[in-house]
Regions:
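A "functional boundary" signal
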Residues: 5-13, 17-165
Length: 165
């Protein structure tokens, strides 16, 4: 009898954890859909996710990257450096997640630009471009090339800027 109760209790806890993880994953899918048309709604969905439900590193990294993306698209001037570190800590070790790795590099480069570090930003943009060639997301690629061109234009290197525009 005790064994049966223990098994039932353990299975309930495990099942509840899986349900919570699925709920968060479904919220992430909704956020990705809302990013293009309503980034402020995506931000609200992300803020409604309790921190306890982001159990593993992969979920925390995905949350961080989605939050950064939503803040950028909603044109909020939030300091997202700590979230960038969370995302980078995970994605630099997982090359199979190349698209998220490139997006993290892109946002890290923008953070460097905001700090006034153009050479550091350019290095990160070019690293993202190097890895981005195998991807077929036209929006991300276009934003990356536009940013690289802007940095070169700011340095008065119009020949290289023209190549990226």
């Amino acid at each position: 009898m005790k064994r049966c109760i223990c098994v039932l209790l353990v299975s309930t806890v495990l099942f509840g954890g899986c349900m919570n993880r699925n709920r968060v994953a479904n919220t992430f899918v909704q956020v990705e859909k809302a990013l293009a048309v309503a980034p402020d709604s995506a931000m609200r969905l992300l803020k409604d996710i309790p921190a306890k439900s982001l159990g593993n590193q992969a979920m925390r990294a995905r949350y961080a990257l989605l939050y950064i993306d939503a803040a950028e698209r909603a044109q909020l001037n939030e300091n997202t450096d700590s979230l960038l570190r969370i995302a980078w800590r995970y994605y630099r070790k997982h090359p199979q997640e190349m698209q998220n790795r490139c997006r993290t590099l892109y946002y890290m480069a923008h953070s460097k630009l905001r700090q006034g570090d153009k050479p550091g930003a350019l290095r990160l943009f070019l690293e993202a471009e190097e890895n981005n060639d195998s991807l077929d997301n036209p929006r991300d690629r276009g934003m990356l090339y536009l940013s690289i061109g802007d940095v070169y234009r700011g340095e008065l290197n119009f020949v290289r800027a023209y190549r990226y525009y």
